[in-house]
Amino acid sequence: MPELPEVETVRRELEKRIVGQKIISIEATYPRMVLTGFEQLKKELTGKTIQGISRRGKYLIFEIGDDFRLISHLRMEGKYRLATLDAPREKHDHLTMKFADGQLIYADVRKFGTWELISTDQVLPYFLKKKIGPEPTYDEDFDEKLFREKLRKSTKKIKPYLLEQTLVAGLGNIYVDEVLWLAKIHPEKETNQLIESSIHLLHDSIIEILQKAIKLGGSSIRTYSALGSTGKMQNELQVYGKTGEKCSRCGAEIQKIKVAGRGTHFCPVCQQK
């Protein structure tokens, strides 16, 4: 599943290439992906201009005209690509925005991705309802004190809690494993057992890993690419997908276990319970 760095990379590519484009038409071969109704979306957005592309956590937000926002979630394997108007349709192409000189195509092998059309004034309530946590930056949004308070009030295991998106936005399986390795925290550690120095290191590790991944264009693992461009973060991963290899920090063998049903990679020496 694309995580925050991959979605941000897609956002930046879309921003460079489609902002300012007028939507001539919208087509769907699998209209059920539009949760708010394809016909309404087609009616409201045809003829409108894409004014910007923003992001909240793993969600892309197409800013179209003044009145509407199109919320896109890539889920497991969704991806966008740009093509010429005469490009042949491919097997897993499901949604298309056509412009005067090209088209933006959304393809999804598993059909899990979604589009939702909401009014501009409903964007904030939309994400408040989903309880998406703060963005992982050093500004006031990702407040370390509030982060610490939430961890200390919970008996949840740290990995599944980070995956919930309520503590901080955008973390998925790959980067949670990387963050916990960097912070030297066992993925099954109960959050109320974390000492203050560990929480501080965890807070900063989340920011460091995700910002580094954004800088490197995300991790191109399995099917991910950002409009055809591959990322480089996969070359920097320390534990994810490294089962049986030596930890770069201590030399111990990286292990893989299941935590809350998710494959989890960690160093048994650096990340002790």
From Swiss-Prot:
ZnF (FPG-type) ranges: 238-272
Further comment: The zinc finger is important for DNA binding.
CDD domains linked to this entry: EcFpg-like_N
Subunit details: Monomer.
Intrachain disulfide bonds: none
UniProt-annotated catalytic positions: 2-3, 58, 262
Entry keyword DNA-binding: yes
Record organism: Lactococcus lactis subsp. cremoris (Streptococcus cremoris)
Keywords: DNA damage, DNA repair, DNA-binding, Glycosidase, Hydrolase, Lyase, Metal-binding, Multifunctional enzyme, Zinc, Zinc-finger
Example GO molecular function: zinc ion binding
SMART domains registered for this protein in UniProt: Fapy_DNA_glyco, H2TH
Leader peptide range in chain numbering: none
One Pfam family in the UniProt entry: zf-FPG_IleRS
GO-annotated biological processes: base-excision repair
Cofactor annotation comment: Binds 1 zinc ion per subunit.
Name of the protein described by the UniProt record: Formamidopyrimidine-DNA glycosylase
Organism superkingdom: Bacteria
Known EC number: 3.2.2.23, 4.2.99.18
Amino acids binding DNA: 92, 110
Recorded catalytic activity of this chain's protein: Hydrolysis of DNA containing ring-opened 7-methylguanine residues, releasing 2,6-diamino-4-hydroxy-5-(N-methyl)formamidopyrimidine; 2'-deoxyribonucleotide-(2'-deoxyribose 5'-phosphate)-2'-deoxyribonucleotide-DNA = a 3'-end 2'-deoxyribonucleotide-(2,3-dehydro-2,3-deoxyribose 5'-phosphate)-DNA + a 5'-end 5'-phospho-2'-deoxyribonucleoside-DNA + H(+)
Cofactor(s), by name: Zn(2+)
